[in-house]
Structure formats: C-alpha cells, structure tokens
Amino acid sequence: MLINVISIFPKMFDIIKDYGITKRAIQKHLVKINVLNPRKFTKNKYKNIDDRPYGGGPGMIMTAEPLFLAINQAKSLSSNPVKVFYLSPQGKKLDQSKIMELSHQKHIILLCGRYEGIDERLLISKIIDEEISIGDYVLSGGELPAMVLIDSICRVTPGVLKNSKAIQEDSFYNGLLDYPHYTRPKCFNCIKIPNILLSGNHSEIKRWRLKQSLTKTWLKRPDLLNKLILTKEQESILHECQSKMDKPKI
C-alpha cells in the first residue's frame, strides 16, 4: 500500500517510520509512506503557502495552487486509483470500520492542513474526496491525525502483526470494547488475577472474556451496543450481567 502525505512538516513523519508497527510494515514492504512538501510546489521566491483570508478575520489560509500541484504529483506516483483525504475537524469521525475500508486501498493521499485551514475551492471542486476527523477537538495541524490514521491502517494490514488474532481481539474490531488483560505476577498490589484464567478451560475462558467485553462496553460505551445486532449467546450473557447490576438496561 502506498500512503502519500502532503505536509509542510515532512520530518514529523520520520518518527512513525522509525518505530513500532509502522516501521515493521515498511520493513516488510507492505506499506510505503511518502511525504510531499507543498512548499516545493510554490511559484513565489519566499515559498509561501499561506495568505490572508478574503473578507478579513484572524489567521492565515493555505493557498489552493501548491496543494493542488502536490496532490497531482502524489497521484502520479502510482497507477492505482486513489482518493484524497483531508484531515479536518469538520470531517466524518474516524472509526474502526473506516480503518478497515482504507486498509484495502492500494494508494491513498492524506492532506494535512495548517493555520486556519485550506482554501475552500479545493473542496468545492472535488479535488479532495473526503474529510476525516479523529475527534471533536482542534489540533495545530493535520499531521498528528494523519499519523493516527497511518498507525491504525498498518496495524490491520495482513502480514504486519505476527499474530493476526491480536487484531480480531482489539477493541472495536467486532464492535465491542476489549476484555481485560493480565500477566505475571499472579498477585500485584494485593490484587489477584481471576481464577478462570488459570483454569486451562479454554471454552470457559472464551466465555468469560466475551462477558467482560460485553459488560465493559455496556458500562463505558453503551452507544456501541445500539449499533450491533447481538447473537443469542451475546444477548444472554449481557442480560446476565445487567441483572446483577443497578445500571438500567438498554
């Protein structure tokens, strides 16, 4: 998969190339990350990529032409169909289903905004295909959201993780939050791990984990349950949990 990033701070992306899951994905030649600086596509001697907004107001706006030229250059780096995604607080909120969708693409372009944003004509003229947000808050630019997106995509790319089951047990993969995890020692701070995890009974452990996952989702993110069609087993386990607690059923 080719991920082309358009950013005025290309060195920020050196970090994700050198560590963790993204480094492994690159080393295995499963993902390639390329960063283009729109300053290289400006036609003024000062390499400015921003200007004052028409109509007045605070801050500066990223100009359309260098971004447009950078996008075209990024598109030319692959013969595969490509979509351009603008990291923006006005976009649709990123979730696991979107990550899975993007992970199947062969080429994507991520546009990182700065200042007060980009010239609206890039959106009006459909040069940008979609806006993506990582939450209802504002950052200084689109670089960190782009890194979040890249890390998530690399994690679900087949062949990156040694154990593919780890992905299937992540929070949100099946619409639920993850179950609790424990490791050595057996007792820490006077708290022992649940006996079921020492039993060796894999079917009971699997049921316990499903119960914990359902309970945690119900208590912390009940909105997620409203989006799911639960199996009969899941409904039975959830009702069992709800009957033992005071929290209203959903």
Swiss-Prot record:
Pfam families: tRNA_m1G_MT. Its EC number is 2.1.1.228. Its main location: cytoplasm. It comes from the Bacteria. Disulfide bonds: none annotated. The keyword S-adenosyl-L-methionine applies. It catalyses: guanosine(37) in tRNA + S-adenosyl-L-methionine = N(1)-methylguanosine(37) in tRNA + S-adenosyl-L-homocysteine + H(+). GO terms for molecular function: tRNA (guanine(37)-N1)-methyltransferase activity. The keyword Transcription regulation does not apply. CDD domains: TrmD-like. It is found in: Cytoplasm. S-adenosyl-L-methionine binds at G113, I134, G135, D136, Y137, V138, L139. Keywords: Cytoplasm, Methyltransferase, S-adenosyl-L-methionine, Transferase, tRNA processing. One of its GO terms (biological process) is tRNA N1-guanine methylation. Homodimer. Specifically methylates guanosine-37 in various tRNAs. Belongs to the RNA methyltransferase TrmD family. PANTHER family: TRNA (GUANINE-N(1)-)-METHYLTRANSFERASE (PTHR46417:SF1). This is tRNA (guanine-N(1)-)-methyltransferase. It comes from Buchnera aphidicola subsp. Baizongia pistaciae (strain Bp).
